[in-house]
Design a protein with these regions (language model features):
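N-terminal amphipathic, basic helical "cap/leader" segment at the start of enzyme domains
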Residues: 1-90, 189
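Active-site-flanking beta-strand signature of metal-NTP-handling nucleotidyl enzymes
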Residues: 94-98, 163
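Generic preference for hydrophobic
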Residues: 48-50, 95, 184-185
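Short, electropositive alpha-helical surface patch
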Residues: 147-160
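Beta-hairpin (beta-strand-turn-beta-strand) motif
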Residues: 53, 98-102
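Small-aliphatic-rich amphipathic alpha-helix that forms the alpha element of a beta-alpha
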Residues: 34, 101-149
Length: 189
């Protein structure tokens, strides 16, 4: 069963979502799956901020405005701005996933980032397993200090993505891989 969920999980962007609302208790169940990610030293560095309803719409508008105000003119893209403004239109919930950096200096930051990434993957596999739609976005100001300030995060924390969750009526596209496994794996016996 998990094999097919992994192979069938697809990115479904908010524009492909139909605007139907996922019950909050289902979102909580999906976040509980995320909580079971592997992590070094039991630091559990993943944190989630969940937006829904009017608060999600407001966040998307404010994120777009922050993008406009903090992006140099030569890098600003009107399409990106419009996508940020309208991202909530089809989504049910928006989840900001970030790494809460622990105080243990023996745990490298990279391990904490990997743990949060694993938590996001758990969330997305749960989404796929329930026949829901999900999109892990790293666009806009995800990697910018301005978003961290907006969210009230600490300097050492790191936003790893905005996950849009919803429902889609569109059939899933067939998955494909471009690079053969023989080029990705080296066996030493």
């Amino acid at each position: 069963m998990i094999d097919s969920i992994i192979r069938q999980r697809r990115t479904i962007k908010p524009a492909q979502m139909n605007g139907k609302v996922i019950p909050d208790d289902m979102i909580s169940q999906l976040l509980e799956l995320a909580d079971w990610a592997p992590n070094h030293g039991r630091t559990e560095p993943w944190r989630f901020i969940v937006y829904a309803g009017d608060k999600m719409v407001s966040f998307c508008e404010e994120h777009a405005q922050l993008y406009k105000e903090n992006t140099p003119a030569e890098k600003f893209k009107t399409t990106s701005y419009n996508n940020l403004v309208h991202a909530s239109e089809g989504a049910s919930h928006l989840v900001i996933a970030y790494m809460k950096r622990g105080a243990n200096p023996n745990i490298p930051e990279m391990e904490e980032v990997a743990a949060v990434s694993a938590a996001i993957q758990n969330l997305l596999l749960g989404v796929a397993g329930h026949g829901l739609a999900g999109f892990w976005s790293t666009s806009g100001l995800v990697h910018n200090e301005v978003l961290k300030e907006y969210l009230g995060l600490q300097q050492e924390d790191k936003v790893l993505g905005i996950i849009y969750l919803g429902i889609s009526d569109d059939p899933l596209k067939e998955g494909k891989r471009i690079i053969p496994m023989s080029e990705k794996v080296k066996w030493i016996k």
